[in-house]
Design a protein with these regions (language model features):
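Structural core segment of the AMP-binding/adenylate-forming
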Residues: 1-11, 121-193, 629-634
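Conserved pre-ATP/AMP-binding loop-to-beta segment of ANL
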Residues: 38, 53-56, 177, 182, ...
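Conserved AMP-binding/adenylation subdomain of ANL enzymes
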Residues: 118, 238-255, 263-309, 324
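Conserved AMP-binding A3 loop
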Residues: 72-76, 215-239
Length: 635
């Protein structure tokens, strides 16, 4: 008889507690390949469905309203519809190596599309909030053959973006429209019409999906240059669900409040695949997930209604929930709060522990590790600020690397270095081989680009991002400790520190804060607060700038490039002020550049032709001391 863990052949009726490192090492004596019961994500969802066929797989809310009756899809119906979707894509010509991209909000058929695409070919979830040119770059880099997208609908511009990018997609054979009538003569098909024509009890292709087969391409990285596409195998993704269900003791019938995007591995794998493969249920808060203001506003009533064990999201959402008093809501079902995607500020973690009386399970990983790689093991003491220990069969090292990314040595306990990781979740490389330069250390250890340390007990502490360092006159300043100090100010809701250009030092630290609703600060108050609490004088921000809102990515991380561009604009505008004082119309805009990373564009307007070259020369002289590239444009 099968044990409690749907994805493990050997675990019996009780999960192991794994309370010590010795217990984990003993558990690992059995090879992982002998344990795992699913070779593909399709298998994993099927095994979860067998545990709870008539239970809810998805409970869909239209507007995060706990009083609404959700649309319920059972596990039996979900795996049937995934099978139909795979057959639909096969009928449209998709084979094992073909890419099915999708741009969808969190509607039920988005989840069906993700796993149907992986069963038919290769799924490629795309952030529909990106600009059309970025979407086109991703779809072309992936060689997209089929695109699934939301049809025309008020309040969303997804279809308009599809129409804009379609002419640029050389490999595209078909578009499938969710909530649309389609236009078959023009290669646009209605999802609802096509899927119902397909059998739900078998894969028509007869495909036997191997663990080594590519399951998905996830886009990652910044906003410039060729998009990085991370290749996940089915085995990579199944490991995520296997390990998290093991450590969090997944069981059929549990509910998870879900609002993460599917183009982020924290949503599609950490939460969705893990939940479905255990026979548990996703309570989908709305098509826009946590972005719907009702999701946070109604959070405690939603907890009372659906009784989840975990409050799980990105740190920005966790911080926002703290501003909503639970009142009389019964939130006793909650056993822990979990967050990842970026570091949970210690101030936020402490507030969760104090106000909600919940332990904080911080997780760490990246798209390249198929999401979570380390976490705070339940049952062991929580070390607030640490991201815990590697999951079973995974490993972490802290190392010193040379300028070419080659290994110099391993760091000692408590010594800060670069975090590198290996294990069953670690990807095999980016789709574009040019992106693999420097991605791995000794071929199997992925270079995270993060700085961290291991304490004496092997707990991982992330101390910063190598590229987030502020380098002041050759002195490396880690922004994380300064951000923590800013967070502790009672008026500060969110904080970030970046480098602003400086002609002498190269960079100087500058702080940005988003104040809590209704909060006010006096001029100089935040600067004084940080100065008094920062032992390292060079690390004190030269200025702390309140902004609203703080720029964030689609998954709630602070988008630091935007802050760096803003800081540079402020500096260069000040440097060019003498030209403005002479009546010259001079405007500075800093943004991304494909080759240089960032560039300052100085626009000179209304100059007589005989003065243009001379004034442009003055701009070049004034900006020459700065490292950032610049260009002058005449308007």
């Amino acid at each position: 008889m099968a044990g409690i863990h749907a994805l493990d052949r050997l675990i019996g009726n009780d999960y192991p507690d794994l309370l010590t490192d010795e217990e984990v090492r003993a558990f690992e004596q059995v090879p992982y390949a002998d344990r795992v019961a699913a070779e593909s994500t399709y298998d994993a969802i099927r095994l979860g469905a067998e545990r709870n066929p008539d239970g809810a797989a998805v409970q869909f809310l239209q507007n995060a309203d706990p009083a609404d009756t959700p649309l319920v899809i059972t596990h039996r119906d979900f795996i049937a519809r995934v099978t139909q979707a795979a057959n639909m894509f096969h009928a449209l010509g998709a084979e094992k190596g073909d890419v099915i991209s999708f741009m969808l909000p969190l509607v039920p058929d988005a989840f069906v599309t993700l796993f149907g695409a992986e069963a038919a070919g290769i799924a490629n979830p795309v952030n529909p909030l990106l600009e059309p040119h970025q979407i086109a770059e991703i779809l072309e880099a992936a060689n997209t053959k089929i695109l699934v997208a939301l049809g025309p609908m008020p309040g969303t511009d997804i279809w308009q973006k599809v129409e804009q990018v379609r002419p640029q997609l050389k490999h595209l054979k078909a578009i499938v429209q969710v909530f649309g009538g389609g236009d078959p003569a023009n290669g646009v098909f209605a999802f609802g019409d096509l899927i119902k024509q397909q059998p739900s009890d078998r894969l028509v292709s007869g495909r036997k999906i191997r663990g080594s087969d590519i399951a998905a391409y996830f886009h990652t990285g910044g906003t410039t240059g060729t998009p990085k596409l991370v290749r996940h195998t089915h085995a990579n993704q199944v490991y995520q669900a296997w390990a998290l269900n093991l450590l969090l003791k997944g069981k059929p019938g549990a509910n998870l409040l879900f609002g993460m995007p599917l183009f982020h591995v924290g949503g599609s794998l950490t939460q969705v695949l893990t939940t479905l493969s255990s026979g548990s249920s996703l309570v989908v808060l709305s098509p826009s997930g946590w972005r719907n203001p009702n999701a946070v506003k109604n959070i405690w009533q939603l907890v009372e209604r659906f009784k989840p064990e975990a409050l799980s999201s990105v740190p920005t959402v966790l911080a926002a929930t703290l501003a909503v008093p639970p009142g009389n809501a019964d939130i006793s079902s909650l056993k822990y709060a979990a967050g990842g995607g970026s570091a949970i500020p210690v101030a936020v973690g402490s507030a969760i522990q104090e106000k909600l009386k919940l332990p904080v399970v911080e997780v760490y990983g990246m798209t390249e590790t198929s999401s979570v790689h380390t976490l705070a093991y339940p049952g062991r003491p929580i070390r607030l600020g640490s991201v815990g220990l590697p999951m079973p069969y995974s490993r972490v090292r802290i190392v010193q690397l040379d300028a070419d990314g080659r290994l110099i040595r391993d760091c000692k306990p408590e010594e800060i270095g670069v975090v590198i990781m290996a294990g069953p979740g670690v990807f095999g490389g980016y789709l574009n081989d040019e992106h693999n330069k420097g991605a791995f250390v000794d071929e199997v250890w992925v270079n995270s680009g993060d700085l961290g340390r291991l304490d004496a007990d092997g707990y991982l502490w992330i101390t910063g991002r190598a590229k987030d360092l502020v380098i002041r006159g050759g002195h490396n300043i880690d922004p994380a400790p300064i951000e923590e100090i800013m967070f502790r100010h009672p008026a500060v809701g969110f904080a970030a520190v970046v480098g602003q250009p400086d002609a002498y030092a190269g960079e100087l630290p500058v702080g940005y804060v988003q104040l809590k609703p209704g909060a006010k600060v006096e001029p100089g108050e935040l600067e004084a607060w940080v100065r008094e609490r920062t032992p390292e004088r060079a690390a004190v921000p030269v200025q702390v700038i309140p902004i609203n809102p703080m720029p964030v990515t689609g998954v709630g991380k602070v988008f630091k490039p935007q802050l760096r561009w803003d800081a540079a604009e402020r500096v260069f505008t000040k440097v060019l002020a003498p030209l403005v004082e002479r009546g010259i119309d001079c405007n500075v805009k800093v943004g991304p550049h494909g080759s240089h990373g960032s560039i300052a564009t100085v626009t000179l307007a209304g100059l007589p032709p005989d003065q243009r070259e001379a004034i442009a020369g003055e701009v070049h002289v004034l900006l020459a001391p700065f490292v950032m590239r610049h260009e002058v444009v005449q308007a």
